[in-house]
Amino acid sequence: MTDRDRLRPPLDERSLRDQLIGAGSGWRQLDVVAQTGSTNADLLARAASGADIDGVVLIAEHQTAGRGRHGRGWAATARAQIILSVGVRVVDVPVQAWGWLSLAAGLAVLDSVAPLIAVPPAETGLKWPNDVLARGGKLAGILAEVAQPFVVLGVGLNVTQAPEEVDPDATSLLDLGVAAPDRNRIASRLLRELEARIIQWRNANPQLAADYRARSLTIGSRVRVELPGGQDVVGIARDIDDQGRLCLDVGGRTVVVSAGDVVHLR
């Protein structure tokens, strides 16, 4: 057993339920499973069968078919990450605002881990739309998928992976100097932060957008956006609009991007 293996005890489902499920909480159900293909796919399947997944949390110790944006895989090591999906009812919110939900999730993840890591604020933040970066490495990612009347938000947060266990451009809490990251505490804090940000999103609270802009590493940067159709656009990221889209200054004209992969250029 390696030192990292010793830092990978199982999650305590009962404790998480005791902390997060109850009167006044937005979370109605929480389950921890040893292994699944994809927590997002599992909640989407429940929604398709007619189940009410609003406020449902599904956490997996290991994912064998995790997915990132645009159909890419999400690497996973057993008990080395926090891998979870939640269901959010969205039909009572204007569809134009749905794009901000995944941005809110990224902000919640960032807020849950930023106090733990000794990284200057200028090196920790959000890459549009919702990647959590620290020292240039990807620490966490979000995948939002619609299954009306719900959106399923998936979170993958790297906790104790070694460099060889993650993609070259990724990092983990352990490698950022968190000596013994406690996944139970982090998961609990993350879900509390996520609940608070969902409430802000649902209420159209302007503080959500203000906080996101303050923590954005993309706004003000020269970027290349790789669009889903295979084209690229290069410009200065100026803002995020009220639909969660990235607004670029491209040679003096504004180009609005709703989906794509951002590369920060030097």
Curated annotation (Swiss-Prot):
As a miscellaneous remark, the entry gives: Identified as a drug target. Inhibited by Bio-AMS, an acylsulfamide bisubstrate inhibitor, and analogs. Bio-AMS displays potent subnanomolar enzyme inhibition and antitubercular activity against multidrug resistant and extensively drug resistant Mtb strains.
Instruction: Give the UniProt family note.
Output: Belongs to the biotin--protein ligase family.
Instruction: Alphabetically list the UniProt keywords.
Output: ATP-binding, Biotin, Ligase, Nucleotide-binding
Does the record bear ATP-binding in its keywords?
yes
What PANTHER family is this protein classified in? BIOTIN PROTEIN LIGASE, BIOTIN--PROTEIN LIGASE
The UniProt record gives the binding positions of biotin as: 38-39, 63, 67, 138
Q: What is this protein called?
A: Biotin--[acetyl-CoA-carboxylase] ligase
Q: What does this protein do?
A: Catalyzes the transfer of biotin onto a conserved lysine residue of the biotin carboxyl carrier protein (BCCP) domain of acetyl-CoA carboxylase and converts it to active holo-BCCP. Forms an acyl-adenylate intermediate. Cannot use GTP or desthiobiotin.
Print the organism lineage: Bacteria, Bacillati, Actinomycetota, Actinomycetes, Mycobacteriales
| Reported pH dependence | Optimum pH is 7.5-8.0.
What does the record say mutating residue 138 to S does?
A: Loss of activity
Q: Which InterPro entries match?
A: aa-tRNA-synth_II/BPL/LPL, Biotin_CoA_COase_ligase, BPL_C, BPL_LPL_catalytic
Q: Which gene name belongs to this protein?
A: birA
Q: Which GO terms describe its biological process?
A: positive regulation of cell population proliferation; protein modification process
Organism, scientific name: Mycobacterium tuberculosis (strain ATCC 25618 / H37Rv)
